[in-house]
Amino acid sequence: MNDTIQKNLQYKKYVLDSRLQYFKPHSSIIEKTFAEEIFSSLNRDSKFINPKFFYDKKGSDLFEKICSLPEYYPTRTEISILKKLQTKLSLFLDDSFQLVELGSGASVKTRLILDIFTKFKAKIEYFPIDISEILTESSEQLLKDYDGLHITGIIDTYEGGLKFLKNYNNKKNLILFLGSSFGNFTPTEGHKFLQTIYSVMKPDDMFLIGLDLVKDKQILESAYNDSKGITTKFNLNVLSRINDELDADFNLNNFSHYSIYNTKHQRIEMYLKSLMNQSVVISKSNFLLNLAKDELIHTEHSHKYRLDQIYNLLNGVGFKIKHTWLDDHDYFSLTLVSKN
């Protein structure tokens, strides 16, 4: 990427060493977007906070803890699938592929994919895209563990990072979207997101996506309301972030975590419940938020899918299904698709 394109896209380049660099949008753009989005999403009757704002440094750390909880099945089931792919995924790839991940690369799942790449590539070019600053920390640790790894991080939203990457080079990509984050989108958002993926993919690119499957309601609700209260802390942390970054005065003791599985819409719904009538100042959004007792702020939904829905979803955008892998209990799926 030349300096002119980088400047036009409003990104700044940081070079940490010969194998690690990252790009980040100018901070004023991010702050403006955060303040505007919070104002827009809370200044309405049906209040919500976009779940992408969960993942500051503390939020990302809390989510890593959630992933190790016994109730939270998605991570361990997806890992079990990835272990099966150690000899299978490489059949669809060659040594000209570079790796793009939507996420920080902090988990064992990233390492399982990198292990596959090391079997047929001496030099691995890896592009993690994450809105959280944890990206640089996780990248530094990966460099210590993988000698042939070269990392170019993009600290931005997934959509922003993908559009930036489209102009970066002409090499083939395997794009990863692991975990069950796709389920956080509404159907309209999900379709638009997949269209974005499709539009930035080159003809020979591949896309590997993790999707959570429909299962027993009790299993689902336990996964999002754990006995140790880590999910509660994770949910409340988004208010702490608004306090810190937008100069707000949320009192976290005035809110509780609430989640439920909506069978009709096949999704977990997660909320912050106001425990009293209260007012909150959000200075950088120039906004006074008034909440009634028991009023809900929607913070996340996590859709669950049947396999036929997954295929219809991906085919509807234009993807060609290459293969789907499941865990032993059919709790989770990984589907590999191509553009052509």
PLM segments and residue spans:
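Substrate-binding/catalytic lobe of Class I Rossmann-like enzymes that use SAM or dcSAM, i.e.
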Residues: 221-303, 307, 311-317
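N-terminal auxiliary segments of SAM/dcSAM-dependent transferases
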Residues: 2-52, 60
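Conserved beta-strand signature within the Rossmann-like core of class I S-adenosyl-L-methionine
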Residues: 199-214
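Core SAM-dependent methyltransferase catalytic element
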Residues: 272-275, 326-340
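Class I SAM-dependent methyltransferase Rossmann-like catalytic core
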Residues: 46-91
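A short, conserved alpha-helix within the catalytic core of class I
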Residues: 184-196
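Conserved class I S-adenosyl-L-methionine
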Residues: 96-105
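Conserved SAM-binding loop of SAM-dependent methyltransferases across substrates and taxa
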Residues: 106-121
